[in-house]
Amino acid sequence: MAAPKQAARKPRRRDRKSVPVGQAHIKSTFNNTIISITDPSGAVVSWASGGDVGFKGSRKSTPYAAGMAAESAARKAMEHGVKKVDVFVKGPGSGRETAIRSLQSAGLEVGSITDVTPQAHNGVRPPKRRRV
């Protein structure tokens, strides 16, 4: 029986490309806030969320968690050379404004802020009202 062939694999090193201008996509839901920083073509450079930075359960939906997530994503993006971002905000959550402020305070220059929240043209039925 022939011995299995071992292919000599050299370690793949991912080349870190420099992206001076990017886009920050902030998706803020009622349960969490997700920040993705991409290059102009849409390829993700860095991302972070409320759960990613260590919050669990209902704490993920707080503005503080959104700010921490935005700061974390900004730091990772700045390692790739991102200096300026255009911000696209989606969703009704509480962490929208805090995330934008945290991107600025982390050292990223915010060029424009655009709200891209989808509007339903009588699409799906909304969730029922909460009775507490």
Curated annotation (Swiss-Prot):
Annotated keywords: Ribonucleoprotein, Ribosomal protein, RNA-binding, rRNA-binding
InterPro entries documented for this protein: Ribosomal_uS11 (IPR001971), Ribosomal_uS11_bac-type (IPR019981), Ribosomal_uS11_CS (IPR018102), Ribosomal_uS11_sf (IPR036967)
GO molecular function, one term: structural constituent of ribosome
GO cellular component, one term: ribonucleoprotein complex
Transmembrane segments: none
UniProt-annotated stretches for the region Disordered: 1-24
Gene Ontology process terms (BP): translation
Residue ranges with Basic residues bias: 7-16
Keyword Metal-binding included in the entry's annotation: no
One protein family per Pfam: Ribosomal_S11
Statement: the UniProt record of this protein carries the keyword Ribosomal protein: yes
NCBIfam families registered for this protein in UniProt: PRK05309.1, uS11_bact
Subunit and interaction comment: Part of the 30S ribosomal subunit. Interacts with proteins S7 and S18. Binds to IF-3.
PANTHER family the UniProt entry points to: 40S RIBOSOMAL PROTEIN S14/30S RIBOSOMAL PROTEIN S11
Primary role: Located on the platform of the 30S subunit, it bridges several disparate RNA helices of the 16S rRNA. Forms part of the Shine-Dalgarno cleft in the 70S ribosome.
Name of the protein: Small ribosomal subunit protein uS11
Organism: Bifidobacterium longum (strain NCC 2705)
Gene: rpsK
